[in-house]
């Protein structure tokens, strides 16, 4: 049934032009019906359904516009296509500046700041993908909780541990959401603050002991799976130097403006501005070149059905999505 609906949504109602895939907006009602079935959407009233349908139509228009404007990426319907842009960004991101829960507990004594600006001294590999080196754990889903900061931080620690010890861990984002004394749970936070909180508390908990449920809960004391020895915050100013950092350090937590990627499906996003301000935390896991177009590879936390099995690519060397900023970070094991 799912495969049939995929075919209906992705094939039978698409018009293929010379440059892009474009939905026929006259088929919006049929598309919405199939969308609701595919993603198991239920609406409590006719009024709610009408609102969601209008959101869906607006997203179809944005998808068409993105596909016509983009040279290297495809945008399409996904499970969030019945949300308006503001609601989606509010519910499924979570990078928030200036939202300290408890400023008195915040010291930054363990976090060193590194400016990434000079050109690399060594010759770098043309491509790097930490997924091919068993340095990235499976994609997760933050659901409707502004906890991207926790997912990005945990993904960074999981990757570094996997690279160092050749052992995959599944660590608890929920423990960070509940127990981080600096960030604000589902209301948002920052990755380097999360690392500071981990250092203050003493360690990271396994997901087996505290599985993710996607809303703020009560902090409980669980045994630590591992500890970290320090943290770094990076001021990103040079994308070539960032390549070197990625090679030497491993996957890195980065902050972006994800607004232009809501409907991303595949390819290299060549139009990703920073017009809305930084709002999302993800994990930088690699880089490459395809058809002379350089790109970054990033791991999202919106589940494996979004994008390229939970990942996305953006064009390199143009500060895509505002990625060159002062909020990248990494743990030190």
UniProtKB/Swiss-Prot annotation:
It comes from the Viruses. It holds the Pfam family Inhibitor_I29. Its EC number is 3.4.22.50. GO terms for molecular function: cysteine-type peptidase activity. Keywords: Disulfide bond, Glycoprotein, Hydrolase, Protease, Signal, Thiol protease, Zymogen. PROSITE patterns: THIOL_PROTEASE_ASN, THIOL_PROTEASE_CYS, THIOL_PROTEASE_HIS. Residues 21-124 form a propeptide. Synthesized as an inactive proenzyme and activated by proteolytic removal of the inhibitory propeptide. It catalyses: Endopeptidase of broad specificity, hydrolyzing substrates of both cathepsin L and cathepsin B. It is an enzyme of class 3 (hydrolase). Residues 1-20 form the signal peptide. One of its GO terms (biological process) is proteolysis. Glycans are attached at residue 170. Disulfide bonds join 145-186, 179-219, 272-321. CDD domains: Peptidase_C1A. The active site is at 148, 280, 300. Cysteine protease that plays an essential role in host liquefaction to facilitate horizontal transmission of the virus. May participate in the degradation of foreign protein expressed by the baculovirus system. Belongs to the peptidase C1 family. This is Viral cathepsin. It comes from Cydia pomonella granulosis virus (isolate Mexico/1963) (CpGV). The gene is VCATH.
């Amino acid at each position: 049934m799912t495969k049939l609906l995929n075919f209906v949504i992705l094939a039978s109602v698409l018009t293929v032009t010379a440059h892009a895939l474009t939905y026929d907006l006259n088929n919006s009602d049929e598309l919405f019906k199939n969308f609701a079935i595919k993603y198991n959407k239920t609406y409590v009233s006719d009024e709610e359904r009408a609102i969601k349908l209008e959101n869906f139509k607006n997203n179809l228009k944005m998808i068409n516009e993105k596909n016509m404007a983009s040279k290297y990426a495809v945008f399409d319907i996904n499970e969030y296509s019945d949300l308006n842009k503001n609601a989606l960004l509010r519910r499924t991101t979570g990078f928030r500046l200036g939202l300290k829960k408890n400023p008195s507990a915040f010291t930054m004594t363990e976090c060193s700041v590194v400016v990434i600006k000079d050109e690399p001294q060594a010759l770098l590999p043309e491509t790097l993908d930490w997924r091919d080196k068993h340095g990235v754990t499976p994609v997760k889903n933050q659901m409707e909780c502004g906890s991207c900061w926790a997912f990005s931080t945990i993904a960074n620690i999981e990757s570094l541990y996997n690279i160092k010890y050749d052992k995959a861990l599944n660590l608890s984002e929920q423990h960070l959401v509940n127990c981080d004394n600096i960030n604000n749970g589902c209301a948002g936070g920052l990755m380097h603050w999360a690392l500071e909180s981990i250092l203050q508390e003493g360690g990271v908990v396994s997901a087996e002991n505290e599985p993710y449920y996607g809303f703020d809960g009560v902090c409980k004391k669980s045994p630590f799976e591992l500890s970290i020895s320090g943290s770094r915050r990076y001021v990103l100013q040079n994308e070539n130097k960032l390549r070197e950092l990625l090679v030497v350090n491993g996957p890195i937590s980065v902050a972006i403006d994800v607004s232009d990627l809501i409907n991303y499906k595949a390819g290299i996003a060549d139009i990703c501005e920073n017009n809305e301000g930084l709002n999302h935390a993800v994990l930088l896991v690699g880089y490459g070149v395809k058809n002379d177009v350089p790109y970054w590879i990033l791991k999202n936390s919106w589940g494996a059905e979004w994008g390229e099995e939970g990942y996305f690519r953006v064009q390199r060397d143009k500060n895509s999505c505002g990625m060159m900023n002062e909020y990248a970070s990494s743990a030190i094991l």
